[in-house]
Amino acid sequence: MRKFLIKVGLILTAAAGLFIWFRNDASVLAGVHPLGMIDRSGWVAANSHNPDVLNTLESANTGVLFVEIPWEKVEKNPGAFSWQFENDYGSVDLTQLFSRLQRHGIEPVAVLSGGPMYLSHLYPQQPVFRDQLLESLQRFAGAAAEQFGSDVQYWQIGTAINNKEAWGKVLFPLADNALAEPDPILYSEMLRNAYSAIKEYDSRSTILMGGLEFPADCAYHPSNYLQAVADQDAWYAFDIASLSLPTLASSPETATFDACGIMPSTLSGVPSADSVQAVADALNGIGKKPLWVGNLQFSAPELVQEANTHSTIPEAIASDWLARASALLRAFGSADRVIWSLDPLNNTPGLLALQTYANLSTMISGRFAGSTLPDSTDAYALRFRGGGKVNLLAWYTQGGLTANAMIINGMEGYAPVAYSADSDSLKPKDGITLPVDDGGNIALMVSERPVLISGHPKDIKQTISQAVADSTAQASDGMKAKLSHWLQAQKAKAAIKVSDWAAKQQASLLDTLRVSLEKWIRKSLGLA
């Protein structure tokens, strides 16, 4: 017993040491929280002074919140920045907003959007001049980093960068309904400039490539756009790739949105997840980086129709579908984070969904550990492992609210407890303890409403060893990503230095030739 206690003590000491080390570099452990939200309408930004707003988001364990910094509103004249502006819902004070978010445990993601309104342009003949745009963006990004760097770690450069309307707002900031062909070459230059400006202020900052969508024009498909950025040697200039989904118009298992039909190397049978996985495959094929998938929401009319079919309320359907979609994108789409659309005025997400969000933020935060599928094509039981335990999200895709038996295997050595996805509490006493048979199986009743299952190892030694193993694996992934980013940045810096050296040598050579030519001319003319 004494030897066991000594071993446990050593393990705990080592774990504590690792924890302290990792805490000194939080980016190593980045990605623990699997979800986030985006304040697309700007309502939260204009109402952050109301304590109830951020208290609600804090209670939901929001994690990260995307907030736009509209270029045309904060820099109306070159170099004159005002971090307060008006939007459709009131006054926004970005300094106060980011500070408040941090105090509520929410990491802001500052999204640099729009274009410089003060640069000369005329739609559609003349966009803003390229060199002026690049110079202005570097100034804008640097000023924002200096102003908010103590509160903002994450920076997204642009929004919907492969969308003609969004790109039109960059090149023709003052034109209404401007359209412009997306330009990954120009965006790559913008990305490099913003990266250098922000990293110069704080090298620990995390840069996101801005919100790739799934367009109808396959030339600008996220996979093709990523390759174009890589071809411009700008792969080092971002740390995370972000996707922006359209509003989904059917259930999570059937929703489709990629008109180009680009498929991943391995199909899951879930169209939405397969479309995202295809982008993840492209991302990893070029150079592995995390993938955040944003703007998750469902069509309001579809939610109403589904609710009427099953004699329930749209908020309940939304809560269930958001949970199922989040798990599917994490499991089969390789999404490191799934970002929900936040629109409080339209009850998105509703109170039920917010509770579900809070539960999922801890229950699907681990690594995807496989799918325990019962003997049915309409059933899912997705397994996530982290923190020394195994969590599952299980549901049927048919049958409505009628519960049917489900058998899940692989639970030997665990003490599983089941909860509804929107349960008010995840304490064991508030769940249903599930007995494990001799074959490691558990049985429970499940409907289209997803069920959370949390399994802790029965043995304390196994609990400790699994917790350490999970934390080490997570930290290892973080360190590999961090090392990869650092190496890419060093290569880029070296290339820039070589380019600068070559330019200087070329200038020196040209100057020497010019002087020699002048001497020869003067000598030929008898002027020497």
Which residue stretches match the model-derived regions?
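Boundary/entry segment of secreted carbohydrate-active catalytic domains
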Residues: 24-70
